[in-house]
Swiss-Prot record:
Recorded GO MF terms: alanine racemase activity; pyridoxal phosphate binding
Record's keyword annotation contains Isomerase: yes
Upper lineage: Bacteria, Pseudomonadati, Pseudomonadota, Gammaproteobacteria, Candidatus Pseudothioglobaceae
Organism encoding this protein: Vesicomyosocius okutanii subsp. Calyptogena okutanii (strain HA)
GO CC term (a single one): cytosol
Residues annotated as the enzyme's active site: K35 (proton acceptor), Y247 (proton acceptor)
Identification of the protein by name: Alanine racemase
Length: 351
């Protein structure tokens, strides 16, 4: 019997979700988002993505260094470079570099070695990206440098997870208008891959869907959860009417109740703000959270379930209990939960 919190990473689910990407965008190459340690899944545990993507995208140089140790696949550096030192590191790592700000152009243009770049333009999100005017100035300037090869022009949707949001079409129109002359283009994230075929172009950039999470408010059952987090029942007891559970006595029993204390808490990455009633899965039965989440422990009502000390409890990552559900109960998003697992939790690879 293990008394540890364990995160299991399903290799078959990774393969399945990548296949969903390919089925939805059969004519596009795949740039898989593996930033933030593969959305919290650990880059050393996502071999199906690494082996079967055309490119792998990270945010920072430090992430590119770790990724380069385990693969020779092309790496796209989303944050690009600002200083010459960063440029040299990116070249050494054989990264393709995103240019998203006019201050980067001088650094890029001073290269002494061949480099491949992607140019990012702002079509309405106003986070990163060159304006249309800056973009045309950039391609004119860099076209005179034989060491610089522009691989692709990209942009990013602000509201792709809201299928009918008017910004989706306005951004797509702006992108097409600005890049009509460009051979290779990229705009589609997970939500656009699943809902907007006109945005697929030459490269799609799946992120959250690779890990089995729907980019939309409605859960997508075609995607399979990759991360499953589980912990053991550490204690079972019966409390009486009027007894309270947990810090602050925020939950009070209205009748005799059997409760299980489970060995996971916010110190492991379980959400501190999970509400009373947040479900966990015990022996294929959903049981409600009662009382506040502690650093190391949570309590649930198991009055209607047969369970024993040592039984495994799934906190999220089953078809019956998706991470999207836990995020809603906790007033957060699945991205934050996935990337918030603490270092004391053990990760294992499963079939």
């Amino acid at each position: 019997m293990s008394m540890c919190t364990i995160v299991s990473i399903s290799q078959s689910a990774l393969k399945h979700n990548l296949l969903v990407v390919k089925e939805n965008s059969p004519n596009s190459k795949i740039v898989s988002m593996v930033k933030a340690n593969a959305y919290g899944h650990k880059i050393n545990l996502i071999n199906p993505i690494i082996n079967h993507s055309d490119l792998l995208a990270v945010s920072e140089i430090s992430e590119a260094k770790k990724l380069r140790k385990i693969t020779k696949k092309p790496i796209l550096l989303l944050s690009g470079v600002i200083e010459d030192q960063e440029l040299q590191q990116a070249i050494k790592l054989n990264c393709q570099i995103v240019v998203h700000d006019k201050t980067q152009i001088t650094t890029i243009n001073n290269t002494k070695q061949p480099i491949n770049i992607w140019i990012k333009i702002n079509t309405g999100m106003h986070r990163l990206g060159l304006s249309t005017h800056e973009y045309f100035d950039c391609i004119k300037l860099l076209a005179n440098n034989p060491l610089i090869n522009t691989q692709c022009v990209m942009s990013h949707f602000a509201c792709a997870d809201e299928i009918n949001h008017p910004m989706n079409q306005s951004q797509l129109f702006e992108f097409k208008k600005s890049t009509y002359h460009t051979t290779k283009r990229s705009m589609a994230n997970s939500a656009a891959i699943l809902s907007n075929p006109a945005s697929h172009f030459d490269y799609v950039r799946p992120g959250i869907m690779l890990y089995g999470v729907s980019p939309f408010e409605i859960i997508n059952n075609h995607l399979k959860p990759v991360m499953q987090i589980s912990a053991p029942i550490m204690s079972i007891k019966t409390i009486q009417t009027g007894d309270s559970v947990g810090y602050g006595a925020t939950w009070i029993a209205k009748k005799s109740t059997t409760i299980a204390t489970i060995g996971i808490g916010y110190g492991d990455g379980y959400p501190r703000h999970a509400k009373n009633g947040t479900p966990v899965l015990i022996n294929n039965n959903l049981c409600p959270l009662i009382g506040r989440v502690s650093m190391d422990l949570i309590c649930v009502d198991i009055s209607n379930v047969k369970a024993s000390v040592g039984d495994n409890v799934i906190l999220w990552g089953a078809q019956k209990l998706r991470i999207e559900t836990i995020a809603k109960y906790s007033d957060t998003i699945a991205y934050e939960l996935l990337t918030g697992i603490s270092s004391r939790v053990a990760f294992v690879s499963t079939i």
